[in-house]
Design a protein with these regions (language model features):
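Accessory terminal helices/loops
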Residues: 1, 185-190, 199-267
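Conserved beta-strand hairpin/beta-sheet module of binuclear metal-dependent hydrolase folds
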Residues: 1-55, 144-156
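Metallo-beta-lactamase
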Residues: 4-5, 89-134, 139-224, ...
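Conserved beta-strand segments of alpha/beta enzyme cores
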Residues: 9-11, 83, 129-131, 192
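Active-site neighborhood of phospho(di)ester-bond hydrolases with catalytic His/Asp-centered motifs
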Residues: 37-40, 58-66, 84-88, 134-137, ...
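Active-site HxH/HxHxD metal-binding segment of metal-dependent hydrolases
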Residues: 46-125
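Short, flexible loop segments at the rims of nucleotide/cofactor-binding pockets, characterized by
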Residues: 13-19, 36-40, 60-63, 129-134, ...
Length: 267
């Protein structure tokens, strides 16, 4: 399943595996002036390639190595012969078949390994200049692209919403917050967040600050309960009413416990 919408000079390409006629989980790529940012999951490769036949990219950037962001890389390279760029730490991960949990295989599938190049500090298209900013936290290799004159920030998965209930095991909230503060401090007239889940936030700077406040407040509450002798499970029950249902569906890869443990490590 694929949906194409326009935002200013950008095409947003939302993709999802279809089950029972409904999308299972949306992910978004963006095409702007020939630059394709992320390439979706394995179940939507054919539909994406069909769209790109009449909208050919001139280069690709992967925001990070996760399977729902890189699956069409190999096919794009074979068809168009163009360069694909990613963070240095992502290169060996994108170049091999990594093991997936059952939920990942069902929702996104295995991407074919592909050869990508280390991304430079600046990506130039005919009309735009994109600054590459390292934003670890969601993953160690995460990057975003910022076009300062337009106020666009292609933010990948580093920001989802101003409140959250679960995170992945590999995520580090202290590092994530540092990355988001770096973005919020950018000297731009506006900061529009174009996320990999497909949501576009016009007032991105305020959204980032709201999320920062949410995490700081959550960390303070969790630490107070810890000092009162609460276990992680008891903290979860007090602050969230218990574990999120997504934990049992994802082998505890997405869980409230991960979030609580991460904020308890914040200084």
């Amino acid at each position: 399943m694929i949906e194409i919408t326009s935002f200013e000079d950008i095409k947003q390409i939302r993709m999802s595996r279809e089950m029972g006629g409904k999308p299972l989980y949306w992910v978004a790529a963006y095409l702007v002036d020939g630059l394709l940012i992320d390439t979706g999951c394995s179940y939507t490769v054919e539909e994406l390639m069909s769209y790109l036949e009449t909208n050919p990219p001139t280069m690709v950037v992967n925001t990070h190595y996760h399977e729902d962001h890189i699956a069409a890389n190999h096919h794009i390279q074979e068809r168009f012969g163009i360069n694909i760029y990613a963070h240095q730490e992502a290169i060996p991960l994108i170049g091999q078949r990594l093991p997936l949990f059952p939920y990942q295989e069902m929702v996104w599938g295995y991407p074919e390994p592909s050869t990508v190049l280390p991304i430079p500090s600046i990506i130039r298209t005919n009309r735009f200049i994109f600054e590459v900013i390292e934003t670890p936290g969601h993953s160690k290799d995460h990057i975003v692209l910022v076009e300062r004159s337009k106020g666009w920030c292609f933010s990948g998965d580093i920001f989802v919403n101003k409140t959250i209930k679960t995170i992945r095991q590999e995520e580090d909230m202290a590092i994530t917050i540092n990355s988001l503060r770096r973005l919020a401090a950018l000297k731009t007239n506006r900061l529009i967040l174009l996320t990999a889940l497909g949501r576009i936030f016009d007032n991105g700077r305020e959204e980032l600050k709201s999320f920062d406040s949410f995490i700081q407040d959550l960390a303070q509450k969790a630490l107070k309960l810890k000092f009162r002798g609460y276990s992680v499970q008891e903290i979860m029950a007090d602050l969230f009413g218990g574990e999120d249902p997504r934990a049992s569906l994802t082998n505890n890869q997405f869980s409230t416990e991960n979030l609580i443990r991460s904020v308890l490590m914040m200084k």
